[in-house]
């Protein structure tokens, strides 16, 4: 007596059809790709802000050759802090690109995401602090302060003020990108 059991083939196997399997990654992979693209945009914004501020310089040609008025970013410690910080943010974003690629390849791995969200938050804080402090100085350069007898210098140093204002705007674009990166990393770390 034989103890074999005949199991008929299912209709899917007989017809050569496979069971549909959900694509691995899903929306987390889409977030990881968007993360990579935003990091590239953040590099451009922060590097542009640092380069624009670092090259802001204007000399007024009136008076004599030995006595001239000059406005430069290195005349203000706040602007020096701004240039250094935005260069650090750009450098961090460049160094974070491989971790972003790992998040694309392995979208369900929490390690790279956790690492990125912590460092993104640190550099978001630095970028916000430097952008806000530079914005305060640019505001004073444009409007002055009557109570402190600080005169507006943008009437005389128009090119310098235009460059510093553009650098501050670029820094706040980088800040918005970093905020989006933190939010996206937090969404990707959700368990649901």
Swiss-Prot record:
Source superkingdom: Eukaryota
Transmembrane region(s): 31-51, 81-101, 114-134, 167-187
What's this protein's family per the entry? Belongs to the Casparian strip membrane proteins (CASP) family.
Which Pfam family would be a valid example here? CASP_dom
* Upper taxonomic lineage: Eukaryota, Viridiplantae, Streptophyta, Embryophyta, Tracheophyta
The stretches that face the Cytoplasmic side, renumbered to this chain, are 1-30, 102-113, 188-192
Subunit and partners: Homodimer and heterodimers.
Q: What does this protein do?
A: Regulates membrane-cell wall junctions and localized cell wall deposition. Required for establishment of the Casparian strip membrane domain (CSD) and the subsequent formation of Casparian strips, a cell wall modification of the root endodermis that determines an apoplastic barrier between the intraorganismal apoplasm and the extraorganismal apoplasm and prevents lateral diffusion.
InterPro entries from the xrefs?
CASP/CASPL, CASP_dom, CASPL
Q: What is its main location?
A: membrane
UniProt keywords, alphabetically = Cell membrane, Cell wall biogenesis/degradation, Membrane, Transmembrane, Transmembrane helix
Protein known as: Casparian strip membrane protein 1
């Amino acid at each position: 007596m034989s103890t074999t059991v005949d199991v008929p083939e299912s209709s899917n196997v007989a017809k050569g059809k496979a069971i549909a399997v959900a694509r691995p990654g899903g929306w987390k992979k889409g977030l990881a790709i968007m993360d990579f693209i935003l990091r590239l945009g953040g590099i451009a914004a922060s590097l542009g802000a640092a380069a624009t501020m670092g090259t802001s310089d204007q000399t007024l040609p009136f008076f004599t050759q030995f006595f001239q008025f000059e406005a430069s970013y290195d005349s203000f410690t706040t602007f020096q802090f701004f240039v250094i910080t935005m260069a650090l943010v750009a450098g961090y974003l460049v160094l974070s690109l491989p971790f972003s690629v790992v998040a694309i390849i392995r979208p369900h791995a929490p390690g790279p995401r956790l690492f990125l969200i912590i460092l993104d938050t640190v550099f978001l804080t630095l970028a916000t602090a430097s952008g806000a402090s530079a914005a305060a100085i640019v505001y004073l350069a444009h409007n002055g302060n009557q109570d402190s007898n600080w005169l507006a210098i943008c009437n005389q140093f128009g090119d310098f003020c235009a460059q510093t204002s553009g650098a501050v705007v670029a820094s706040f674009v980088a800040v918005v990108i970093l905020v989006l990166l933190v939010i996206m990393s937090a969404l990707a770390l959700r368990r649901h």
